[in-house]
A protein has these predicted regions:
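Conserved alpha-helical scaffold segments that buttress catalytic/binding sites
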Residues: 2-290
Length: 290
């Protein structure tokens, strides 16, 4: 059985509550004096419709990072040389709109100081708060999403802020550029979504080199034989090597943020999914900011 560890009191960071890490940090990242990359968790699990457990993922990714080397041979960088701070998890209230606004406020403060952000989810809805915060500072932003599902519903189960509406809301913000890895459609996406849907290798050609870029990775975009521990698995999918090749092709762009979401640790007793998630974060930091 997957159970939550006994909690401890929250502390205040920048006026907002964050959950202390009790000495568990991503790759042992410490709080540094002048960090350039801000890593934090959003253990959001509010609108999941199939398998629960996304709230455990931020901590599980950190635990899995203990098995990951900090050096990336692919990108020739060691992320211990990156000014990286793991700030813990946002303390959530249970009100999705309010929680997203809290995330947006935190990220806005970091973005206004020129920081890059890495968010560990939590359900995919958390991405909306991060993007909202960055957009308030940069005004112009382009977002690329890897996902097995279109996430293009106007609302789902009566909710407009849902894991099933993420791409729809990003489209409403005017920031969505491309979505790759989709194998599941609800049938009502329409021509508008067809304009965003593309193959993974075609994503870079859609991007504006003059606009900052945010990359959101829903782990269910990957092949479930590699990542079974997700909330809504779909057959087929992207390989780990393909994601790394995407990282390589995006290095020429100004990547301002990255997230890895929808991990569901209780659904993968082997822990392999969380290791993949930790590796993606490590390689992403090395590729974009190393």
């Amino acid at each position: 059985m997957w159970v939550e560890r006994p909690g401890s009191r929250s502390f205040v960071f920048g006026g907002d509550e964050m959950q202390p890490l009790q000495h568990l940090r991503f790759l042992e990242a410490k709080k540094v004096g002048e960090p350039e990359v801000m890593l934090f968790g959003v253990p959001l699990e509010a609108t999941e419709s199939f398998r629960g457990g996304t709230r455990f993922a931020p901590r599980a990714i950190r635990e899995a990072s203990r098995s990951v080397e900090s050096y990336s041979r692919i990108f020739g960088k060691d992320i211990t040389q990156v000014p990286l701070a793991d700030l813990g998890d946002v303390v959530l209230s249970g009100d999705v709109a309010g929680d997203l606004e809290q995330v947006a406020g935190l990220v806005r403060g970091w973005a206004s100081d020129g920081k890059r952000v890495v968010m560990l989810g939590g359900e995919h809805t958390a991405t909306l708060g991060v993007v909202r915060g960055i957009l308030r500072v940069l005004n112009k932003l382009q977002v690329v999403v890897l996902d097995a599902h279109s996430d293009f519903r106007e609302e789902y189960l009566g909710l407009s802020l849902s894991h099933a509406t993420v791409c729809r809301r990003l489209c409403d913000m005017g920031v969505l550029v491309g979505v790759a890895g989709v194998r599941s459609f609800f049938g009502g996406e329409g021509e508008e979504f067809e304009g965003f849907l593309c193959q993974l290798e075609d994503l870079p050609s859609r991007l504006d080199p003059k606009r900052p870029l945010y990359l959101s990775i829903d782990l269910d975009a990957l092949d479930p034989s590699l990542c079974p521990g997700v909330s809504n698995p779909e057959p087929g999918g992207i390989s780990y090597a393909q994601v790394l090749e995407l990282f390589r092709s995006l290095r020429r762009f100004d990547v301002v943020g990255l997230d890895v979401v929808e991990g569901c640790p209780p659904c993968d007793p082997s822990g392999a999914t969380m290791v993949v998630a930790a590796k993606l974060v490590q390689e992403g930091i090395a590729a974009f900011w190393g």
